[in-house]
Amino acid sequence: MTKRFLLAISAIIIIGSAYSQYPPVFKNSIYGHNQKVGHYANVRGFKMYYEIYGKGEPLILIHGNGGSINNFSGQIAYFAKNYQVIVVDSRAHGKSVDTGDSLSYEMMAEDFNRLLDELHIKSCNVIGWSDGGNNGLLLAIHHPDKIKN
């Protein structure tokens, strides 16, 4: 009993410490909540939330599992200097609410494909972090004409 209790307390402390390491920019960032540039697109049965920053060649940023637009707070302004940055809350993440009972990488990659169609973007560059990388890779595999890099 004592070992389990100590193990549980240790796990709580470690997890709490990990979350406290997020830079303040993530906690106080406008990204993911910017009403001036935030929009919803009706994509495959749900409303997909996205924000667009900058001008130039399109670049879509795809966050990882459990993440949101806010996870790219440190990168958006940098890339927006030279690109039209499209940051998206993936299906069932952030402001993109989906109450469906299934979720897959293929499903999410097709969501991004449809969003690009909705935005009339013929091709773009992709940066994906963690599971966002998987989604970007599948998007490139299934729709190679839409992905530059």
Question: For each of these PLM feature ranges, what is it?
Answer:
Residues V87-G128:
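Active-site loop/oxyanion-hole signature of alpha/beta-hydrolase fold enzymes
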Residues T2-L59, N82-Y83:
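Alpha/beta-hydrolase fold catalytic core
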Residues F46-K95:
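Conserved HGGG/HGGXW glycine-rich cap/lid loop of the alpha/beta-hydrolase fold
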Residues L6, I60, I76-A80, S102-Y105, ...:
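Glycine-rich, phosphate-binding/catalytic loops in enzymes
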Residues K122-N149:
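Conserved hydrolase catalytic core segment
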